[in-house]
Amino acid sequence: MAVQDVYRALSDPARRKILKLLQDGPLPAGAIAAEFSISWPSISRHLGVLTNAGLVRHERNGQQVIYQLSTSVLLDIVTELAELTRVGGHNADHPNQERKK
């Protein structure tokens, strides 16, 4: 996983919507496409970007391709971002955090 690929994948609202759709469980590509008013090639491109970033995985089931959320990459990114907020053992600039004097 390249971090920049994950951020690029997450930067698009349509791809974030796909991830939200997959929160409830695996879906066939057709069911994902039915939630959008954009072309099938555009949906396919979005699914490819998400797959290449490691955010979703897919498997073929007969004629269907089933997509599933892959949370491990998301957890890695969230952990990395959370670490960036820590300065001197506490959350920097957190409004509820008392500052040391």
Give the ranges of each region predicted by the language model.
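Amphipathic alpha-helical dimerization/coiled-coil segments
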Residues: 1-2, 8, 70-101
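Core alpha-helical elements of the protein kinase catalytic domain
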Residues: 20, 47-48
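Alpha-helical residues within the helix-turn-helix
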Residues: 34, 45, 51-52
